[in-house]
């Protein structure tokens, strides 16, 4: 069934102990994700976009996913609670999420890509975010597995331990024009300040959110989120900094027959009433971070324990990570050296293979060493070379290199480009011959069997960018990119009928049996362009366009597109600060028709093109109250 388009009305009210809202002065943006240390964005050896705190406040975004819609090369797939994020034609599982440089790795508790969008619910509330850095293209040489498509690093506000306590409270409501669509209500809060002046500080964050269930079959389910976090910051001296973090997030997703879920399921002439579906996801993280800033040497180390629970499917994962990264400043060279150790454990009572004799736990260790050198060969040209070695318990050793150059041709022109390798290790279930994962969507009795002979997926990407900035009120850029993808892990049907002897495993006959294999090669390529114009002191216009295409180079569907991506994407936004207290904004997001795509074992049809237009305003009622409203 086609879900009708809807028009949204959003009202947000925020209160904070802060200075009056004004546009920040133009200044060089500083980023850290491309190299691990601070540098100006025009010098960063990567294609990188930044969503600043000011932009987040101006546009009344609902969450991180909403903010990412305006970034070139980024596609937000799905909708409602099931939004997922893809970069440069790579599927969402190849996008690595970081929070303050630390991994968010939870996909093992939603196998077969069920309930997509879960990872976005683990990200910090907008009130606590300082900026969001988005790297388009592989960064496996620095961050390892999963960073094949790109990296999204959410950087939160620093703890204040020398100033008075400050905070903000933000509440918003979204009312649907179509009364059959669920309304959205959300509140998030942030506070930070000293516990012991100059020595110990703290910050706390919280989020409450609910999206009501649609009264439309195959519409959006009900989603409820409750998030909370606390950070203690200890600064014994000006050179050392310690953070102790704890965060706990809960998500509930509910579907009711006759509302977002069909009242019954029919197989042939037999129909069975559906039951209500209730899913809960729980995520808890603990981490300890040390940062040291010395004369010619900086260091950052952290240890993190991440626990994710899917109680409805009796799945629980544990990811323990220790990471160390150091920068050594040697004249024209900035040397980055580091290492990482990860231990993954998955408990899942859903193993379907009787021959596995009750196997319900999978584990894996891996460690890595990495090095990069940023060499300022001349005043205008910098070359960055990096290499990472990953050692995996199941897959041995993998080497991931990258090389990138930044050339400031003239005062207003910059040429950037490089070659980067990408790497992604198979999931725990995918690599175990003793694991059979249930599948079939509740309509068919199917199973996917793991394969210990799988190889890691790999990619090789090239990009070339030309950027122009008149250092006043105009900027523009164009980037060409190409990615060759090999050893893609895909699902191949062993049999398709319970009458087929091949579909009988351990005395049980399945409707179908699938195997995991490395078969596919693919290519993704495209163009990203951007333009910005500060028309007057109070009026600003930005626009970007992305062209992306993909092609499978081998396998049954050679010559067909790989992923469900629009070839054409266009985003534009106009901001007007009418008075010191009143501002208006508008944005347009156009997505072309998506190509047909490989959906597990067959090609599926794409979706039609669409255009979204949003307009809004912001009003500073007083120094502590900001009111925003919009029509989406």
Question: Which positions does each model-derived feature cover?
Answer:
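Short acidic/polar hinge/loop motifs at secondary-structure boundaries
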Residues: 103-136
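N-terminal periplasmic accessory domains that precede
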Residues: 64-67, 83-86, 97-100, 119-122, ...
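Surface-exposed extracellular loop regions of Gram-negative outer-membrane beta-barrel proteins
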Residues: 103, 108, 263-266, 345-347, ...
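Outer membrane beta-barrel strand-and-loop segments of large Gram-negative receptors
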Residues: 321-325, 338, 362, 368-370, ...
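Gram-negative outer-membrane beta-barrel transporters
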Residues: 168-170, 376-380, 481-484, 504-599
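Periplasmic-side early beta-strands and strand-to-turn transitions of outer-membrane beta-barrels
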Residues: 161-279, 487
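Face-selective signature of the C-terminal outer-membrane beta-barrel domain
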Residues: 233-251, 274-398, 402-410, 474-481, ...
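Conserved C-terminal beta-signal and adjacent last beta-strands/turns
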Residues: 2-12, 192-194, 207, 233-235, ...
